[in-house]
Amino acid sequence: MANTKQPELKEPGPSDNQLIDYKKSNKTEQLTTGYGRPIGERSTVITVGPRGPLLLSDFPYIEDTQRFDRERIPERVVHAKGGGAFGVFEATDDISDICKAKVLKKGTKTRVLARFSTVAGESGSADTVRDPRGFAIKMYTEEGIWDLVANNTPIFFVRDPFLFQMFIHSQKRNPQTHLKDPNMVWDFFASNPQATHQFLFLYSDRGVPDGFRHMHGYGSHTFKMVNDKDEFVWVKFHFRTDQGIKNVEPERAKILAGEQPDCALADLYNAIAKKDYPSWTLYVQVATHEQVQKFSFNPFDLTKVFSQKEFPLRRVGKMTLNENPENYFTQIEQAAFSPAHMPPGIEASPDKMLQGRLFSYADTHLHRLGTNYLLIPVNNPETNKNVKVCTYQRDGAMQVGHNQNGCPNYYRNTFHGPEVTKPEKHLEHATFESGMAARHEANDDDNFSQPRVFYQKVLDDRGRAHLIQNIVEHLQQCTDKDIISRAVAVLANVDDDFGRQLATRLNVNLPKKH
């Protein structure tokens, strides 16, 4: 009997009626060229006679064609598919004992932009793939931009930035077939056991969150906070969803990927349009330098977490998203986030991955958006009216600002060019790391203790069963059986029973323990 199952129909929401709403609130304007000349006809080109050739003097046609040919900019090499919204962050609690940043002063309200995304897929990929989610926050503070470029996972796949490009290549398309290749994914994992913690998180139920509103966000890295006494602590940032965690079952995720591939974008847009504003509460875990020196692991290792029992969450404030973008391209696609953008009082740690990101994010913006990407309104720190950008940076393609007017373009000068006026308030906190410059590998690092806690104590029986099922379903797609054996051998280090169940279901032998 033929399968007569009908596709699942979604209820129309505000996103479906956007054009109707626009029509209700706008009148028809005179069509013009890009340089403002009114156009009298837009359906036909100028030709020599009704059947003759085109004329290059038909500038409205030429202009439209040239602009159309250049509409696309390079998509993000990672986090290409995403959606976002604006809102406000309010610092609700006093943390002045650990941080001097004005954005975190109790009672301060700051405009924010949030962009959520998948990682590996292209800009047209589905929202319900098993993939980490980007959770990037831009705060327009009175001390400049603060970009907290986070994910929905508290850890990552690698701890060294030299491996980042290799990891991303393994998640994307085979360079010859241009197809997603499970052999690449699992070969990388089996060759890099440091990815174990993140792989367990990814293949758990939280690997496919139900939209963007029902997931946490984590700064993941360890950051430094400095107070007005020049005392510092190490912190981890946690944005916890106030909507509660919700995930999508694997079979439903597959259906949505085919029938409603943009469901997460629509869910966020529609919730805000209906005034059902999503919010997240910001917490920090705080550790002193003396405490982290006693850790059994590197506190600046991105594959590790801080125990919440030993370092409980301390509330900082709340982010509420209450404004949809007016134009996706100008405000979301052109948004540029960089972990290097931090206000005084928040600084980087020696985390190798964070240090690598401090360079790479700004570099990719220069490629994708151009030299003056910070002049694009959504990225402009002068969005906060208390900020005045004064630099010795000049010119470059698309310099559409004041270009510092007639101010001297060299430092130092005696002509009232910008000067350091309060060095004690803006100097970075001293860094006291020292050692031999070399490629220090962490081959002896413990890659399995924290994944073991995640498997044995964080997950319940149902969660463990789902984790095993999800891994088996993807791993069995590998056509290289050696990769399957190697991957199971790595995962068996997490838990003996976990390894045995995987080996049995995938029909491989576990290596003997000595």
For the regions a protein language model found, what residue spans apply to each?
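Active-site-adjacent core segments of small-molecule enzymes
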Residues: M1-H514
